[in-house]
């Protein structure tokens, strides 16, 4: 079918190694010998990602695109820091994450109003990999819904401008098992974008 296009991509899991990090502890002078500053090592696995993309041109003016991602966050079970110099008080730091595999979905539409003006709109759903009890302040993740809109204008054969706007609003209340931190995390994003392209 000439109107339908399909694409598949896969990115394997990658492990990032920290081989010579520097750990610095700010503690009262009386405890400084128990928490010596020095090198540490760690590893951070980045998840595998498989993507299916579909595109469909209804006619010369209207087209749709759909993406589905499988993200292997289960690889991130624990973040651990191993210190070269340990004491009775300073042991390897292990932060449990227990993330789960998850999915993300995106749907977008583009409409060519005329030869110069194009309008776009989209919605995305990202399911959180963070289970209950493992939400942390640095990554207060929750299921996310993004709404986007945009407009493009072709001023000439060489000059094109595009503007976009992304909106995201999420809230999650959770208890962290390891850190004993309870709280409600709120994120509000309103991100405008502008690009200008000039082709020689």
Go through the PLM ranges and name each one:
Residues 1-200:
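Outer-membrane beta-barrel porins/channels
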């Amino acid at each position: 079918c000439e109107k339908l296009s399909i694409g598949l991509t896969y990115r394997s899991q990658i492990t990032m190694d920290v081989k010579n990090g520097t750990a610095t502890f700010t503690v009262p002078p009386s405890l400084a010998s128990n928490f010596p500053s020095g090198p540490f090592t760690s590893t951070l696995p980045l998840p595998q990602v498989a993507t299916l993309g579909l595109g469909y041109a209804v006619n010369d003016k209207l087209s749709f695109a759909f993406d589905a991602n499988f993200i292997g966050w289960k690889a991130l079970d624990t973040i651990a820091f191993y210190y070269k110099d340990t004491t009775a008080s300073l042991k390897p730091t292990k932060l449990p994450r227990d993330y789960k595999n998850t999915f993300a979905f995106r749907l977008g539409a583009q409409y060519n109003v005329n030869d110069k003006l194009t309008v776009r709109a989209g919605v995305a759903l990202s399911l959180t990999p963070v289970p209950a009890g493992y939400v942390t302040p640095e990554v207060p993740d929750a299921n996310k819904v993004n709404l986007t809109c945009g407009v493009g204008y072709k001023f000439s054969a060489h000059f094109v401008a595009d503007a976009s706007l992304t909106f995201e609003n999420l809230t999650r209340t959770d208890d962290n098992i390891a850190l004993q931190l309870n709280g409600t995390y709120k994120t509000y994003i309103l991100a405008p974008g502008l690009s200008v392209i000039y082709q020689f």
